[in-house]
């Protein structure tokens, strides 16, 4: 039995060595196990060589099994890779099929397919046909299309839009041809006439202008047609025809012709004004300044953006002053004279760059323009009043000059307009320079210099307060409502008195009463100007509350609140200073006062080159009569004051004129306080407004709540 099992193992080992399968090896192992399970002792008769041989056979069998497993794994991996490649190829084929289907659909949508219904091709046919072969349809063809009823309403609308666009193109082409013919005729006429080189330059500029307009219109039409073809531009039933729509953004042919006429007339006006350099007519200078603005605007390559002509007014003004640097009202002596700017610019191009960058169209510049408009309106009103006053003074002095001791030459040689203009230019320091007041020499309009003044030179306190009240106009709810957003955003001092602002704050409250902190909050909420320098203006608010009789302090649950007594507020009307004997009594003597006034008047008239008051004509009897009339008026006022001194009321004692006038005694209101300032006083007056200017000479009374 042992020999048979050994022979079996040998035969099985040889079979494994010869490349037999792993199944035979398993059978061999099973046979060995069977022999061992029989209970016999197999290891007794086996030698060491047999055991080594058996071990080698087992190792060889394991190696063969491993090789088989590796081969199976490699085959599986190859199969997976092949499957992935097949899937990728299928996906690519599907994508190609989808693309082909899309192309076929696009081709089919462009053609009229009989298999589909009439609605689907009806929406696409006119657009594709118009893109391929745009042609104008005659009325007969349109009637045939309507009779056959082949097209749907949407398709008819698209077709009409395309036809209108084509008609517009034809109209533009005809207009362009006419314009080119006119240009050629004008060029031929100028060449035959043998005009100056300057006129030839103007003609070339005009030609370039026309070419640029044509290019702009063509680009605009192409853009609109592309939008229409893509379906982005449609026409509603209530809208006008298409030929007027694209030109509404730019210019219609009539506007182009009008602009062409303006350019030609402006250039001719420029030639006429250039020959008359000595003329000072304002209209001619305006025309000459507008002509280079248009030409430079057209020739500027940056003046057109996105095919549209930019006609912004500040740009035109800045370009118009490139050829006239000395005439720009916002530039002088190397400084930008925009209100509140005063930036130093080395030359005029630097100023233009600064003007376009710093003072562009934004909220801050708009707010400054609004404030400047208010300042100009107030100054115009003041100028009208001063002109009336000056006319009355001139009439009165003319009557005085007809007396026997006066000169035979009448005083009306100097017109009231000339005198008012020269007088206003004589004292530029009296112009109230707020942060938004222009610093350019634009003929500052001030209160006219008073020839017969009734203000004492020693009472500087009341004069300064009167000057401040003259500028601060009375407040009204309409003024705040109109400029509410402006005052909230712009750091501009409101042109109102503190008393008027406090009254407005109290009246706007629901209970018609406010605490001090609530008044502060109203100031900071309504005006951006009061959000800084709180200590200064809060001090002025406390002064006004404590010193005005119209503000009444009431104790309640909250503490101390302030209310307004309207009766007392309406009583705040100043009396004419000419009727106050206490103020007139404290004036200086007529000779001491008339000497500096006469000198200031002579200096102002001499600076303005008025023939009647020049240094050469100082010996004129008219000036002497004027001075004598001034002395007579002053002497009469002094005598009247001395005679009526005993009749003065206790509240108007002479002691009040020595000290600054208390507001409770004479609160001045801007509507009636029209007494003009003297030249000496206004020259010494600082133009900058202090926040507590109204009561700066009085003690501070702080209300602690």
Curated annotation (Swiss-Prot):
Keyword DNA-binding included in the entry's annotation: yes
Acidic residues bias spans: 695-705
Cross-link (Glycyl lysine isopeptide (Lys-Gly) (interchain with G-Cter in SUMO2)) at residue(s): 315, 400, 405, 470
PTM-bearing positions, type Phosphoserine: 113, 686
Subcellular location, principal: nucleus
Biased composition (Polar residues): 1-19, 276-286, 291-311, 418-431, 640-651
Ranges for region Disordered: 1-41, 267-286, 291-326, 418-450, 639-705
GO cellular component labels: nucleus
Disulfide bonds: none
Entry annotated with the keyword Phosphoprotein: yes
Residue span of region CTBP1-binding: 410-414
Subunit and partners: Forms homodimers and heterodimers with FOXP2 and FOXP4. Dimerization is required for DNA-binding. Self-associates. Interacts with CTBP1. Interacts with NCOR2 and AR. Interacts with FOXP2. Interacts with TBR1. Interacts with AURKA; this interaction facilitates the phosphorylation of FOXP1, which suppresses the expression of FBXL7. Interacts with ZMYM2.
Function of the molecule: Transcriptional repressor. Can act with CTBP1 to synergistically repress transcription but CTPBP1 is not essential. Plays an important role in the specification and differentiation of lung epithelium. Acts cooperatively with FOXP4 to regulate lung secretory epithelial cell fate and regeneration by restricting the goblet cell lineage program; the function may involve regulation of AGR2. Essential transcriptional regulator of B-cell development. Involved in regulation of cardiac muscle cell proliferation. Involved in the columnar organization of spinal motor neurons.
Domain notes: The leucine-zipper is required for dimerization and transcriptional repression.
Name assigned to this protein: Forkhead box protein P1
Organism encoding this protein: Mus musculus
